[in-house]
């Protein structure tokens, strides 16, 4: 996650670290996320939030690809995108603290995929926010945008299941008054994947598939951290973790407020 400075740093993404500010008045952009096609469509997740800058900056500072929120240009930071795990943008440097609040982090997502040869059947418990679909190889895909239960039937002696687990992004910090500093962008939510030999966030190696049998599996989808509000120089809040059957992705770190360091997190 980014730290607060006159023009602040961006939060880290799953694919790259956040960028530092550059003179004379440009804040650092958020680190880019990582692309993944576990659903059959290529989607980029877990971008870091942009750092906040003063109103003399040439433009707002972008968040990283994958849902990172833009940093405020003498204004409020933009929220990270829901269900992509993006970090919130840092608040800018401007006339009042209330006008320089940080953006909230985006919520995470959990996606599971079974091979087409398995004959497995996915379903979700009533009331769960889940999308069950067929892949091109006739495999089953379950996408959870909120916490719930994944029910697996007809799995025989057990099957290998691929997954993508994105945690909630961290919230951006609050900037301060006209004579002070902008705030850092929030870090992206943690990114863990076992699909198609792709690497996890932060350059980690590809993870093993999860071997599952018939039964009910608890899914937790982490919420994004709150952006800091009103209090000058306040830090944002860290994102919440996401998990699937004991495999946990850590929430994104908070963005540092005016003059503060950001917190550690999943990306």
Annotate each language-model stretch with its function.
Residues 1-267:
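Low-complexity, glycine/proline-biased repetitive segments and flexible coils/loops
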